[in-house]
């Protein structure tokens, strides 16, 4: 099970009620950060999250409300004597923007910051999870992200063990470590004595975008779809590259994702006004506040902890 922490749920600019976009996903001891709007470091402090646990940051696009908090996080890591490389991922031109950002002021990090530019669809493999990327429609280079926890092995199956003429013992620990061992003259594979794999959690974050088909495609079987829904109505949206509540709901229904969180609310709306509209337009949707936490397991096991 992974933990999703909403550090900032609003869009465009901070308000007294909410900060600009940032989402942390905790998997084991690691924190994976998606977008770093201004004030994200403060939000992490309030949420009790240690920025030194961050190995990777994924930025959807380079509008200020999605990345201006990056410098504060990097400078704090430096103050705390970080030595581990920090990896930052984003759309084309990320390297230039981040390089310029880090050159401003009298500061240089004492650790490596490696920027990875991604164009289009990619599938990035890490120890316990994968990140899938897809381009979204926001008028500038912009990405959506899928966080996919890797599937876990099934439990040891005593019936399968007995059918091979074996009894439970220390060999099981060795098999779990090595995946294949030899007992006597027989080769035993882990898959032979365990049940079905347990599907890992899948969370999709669209970033800022108009509705596009790839959101539906990449959100299939998602446990949680975090979809931007900046505006209540198309009248408010006008010609901006954003999504309304109803459009986000249509994406959700088409994808058959299990849960929907509406994200990036425009500052013109209070939480109450927006939540009432969301309940009328898409009753299944969840409207997170800053510091809400969602625990996500595979197979649709989702627990919402609202503040």
Curated annotation (Swiss-Prot):
Q: Which UniProt keywords apply?
A: Endonuclease, Hydrolase, Metal-binding, Nuclease, tRNA processing, Zinc
What HAMAP family would the database entry show? RNase_Z_BN (MF_01818)
Q: What is this protein called?
A: Ribonuclease Z
Residues the record lists as binding Zn(2+) 1: 61, 63, 138, 208
Q: What is this protein for, i.e. what is its function?
A: Zinc phosphodiesterase, which displays some tRNA 3'-processing endonuclease activity. Probably involved in tRNA maturation, by removing a 3'-trailer from precursor tRNA. Also shows activity toward a broad range of substrates, such as intron containing pre-tRNAs, 5' extended precursors and non-RNA substrates.
Q: Name one Pfam family in it.
A: Lactamase_B
Look up the EC number in the record and give it. 3.1.26.11
Active-site residues from the entry? 65
Query: What is recorded on activity versus pH?
Result: Optimum pH is 7.0.
Q: Which organism is it from?
A: Pyrococcus furiosus (strain ATCC 43587 / DSM 3638 / JCM 8422 / Vc1)
Q: How is the cofactor bound?
A: Binds 2 Zn(2+) ions.
Catalysed reactions, semicolon-separated: Endonucleolytic cleavage of RNA, removing extra 3' nucleotides from tRNA precursor, generating 3' termini of tRNAs. A 3'-hydroxy group is left at the tRNA terminus and a 5'-phosphoryl group is left at the trailer molecule
Q: Which cofactor does it need?
A: Zn(2+)
Q: Which family does it belong to?
A: Belongs to the RNase Z family.
**SUBUNIT field:** Homodimer.
Q: Which InterPro entries match?
A: Metallo-B-lactamas, RibonucZ/Hydroxyglut_hydro, RNase_Z/BN
């Amino acid at each position: 099970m992974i933990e999703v922490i909403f550090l900032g749920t609003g869009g465009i600019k901070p308000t007294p009620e909410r900060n600009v976009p940032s989402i942390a996903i905790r998997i084991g001891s690691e924190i994976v950060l998606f977008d770093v709007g201004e004030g994200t470091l403060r939000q992490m402090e309030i949420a009790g999250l240690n920025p030194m646990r961050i190995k990777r940051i994924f930025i959807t696009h380079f509008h200020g409300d999605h990345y201006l908090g990056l410098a504060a996080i990097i400078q704090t890591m430096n103050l705390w004597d970080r030595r581990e490389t920090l990896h930052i991922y984003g759309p084309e031109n990320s390297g230039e923007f981040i390089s310029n950002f880090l050159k401003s002021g009298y500061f240089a990090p004492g650790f490596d910051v490696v920027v990875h530019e991604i164009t289009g669809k990619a599938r990035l493999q890490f120890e316990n999870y994968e990140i899938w990327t897809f381009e979204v429609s926001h008028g500038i280079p912009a990405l959506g992200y899928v966080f996919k926890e890797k599937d876990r092995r099934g439990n040891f199956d005593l019936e399968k063990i007995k059918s091979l003429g074996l009894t439970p013992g220390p060999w099981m620990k060795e098999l779990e470590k090595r995946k294949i061992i030899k007992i006597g003259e027989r080769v035993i594979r882990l898959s032979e004595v365990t049940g079905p794999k347990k599907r890992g959690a899948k969370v999709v974050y669209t970033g800022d975008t108009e509705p596009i088909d790839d959101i539906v495609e990449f959100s299939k079987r998602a446990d949680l779809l975090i979809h931007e829904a900046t505006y209540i109505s198309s009248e408010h949206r006008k010609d901006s590259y954003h999504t309304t509540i109803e459009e986000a709901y249509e994406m959700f229904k088409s994808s058959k994702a299990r849960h929907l969180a509406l994200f990036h609310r425009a500052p013109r709306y209070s939480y109450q006004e927006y939540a009432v509209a969301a309940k009328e337009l898409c009753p299944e949707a969840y409207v997170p506040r800053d510091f809400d936490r969602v625990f996500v397991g595979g197979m649709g096991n989702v627990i919402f902890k609202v503040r």
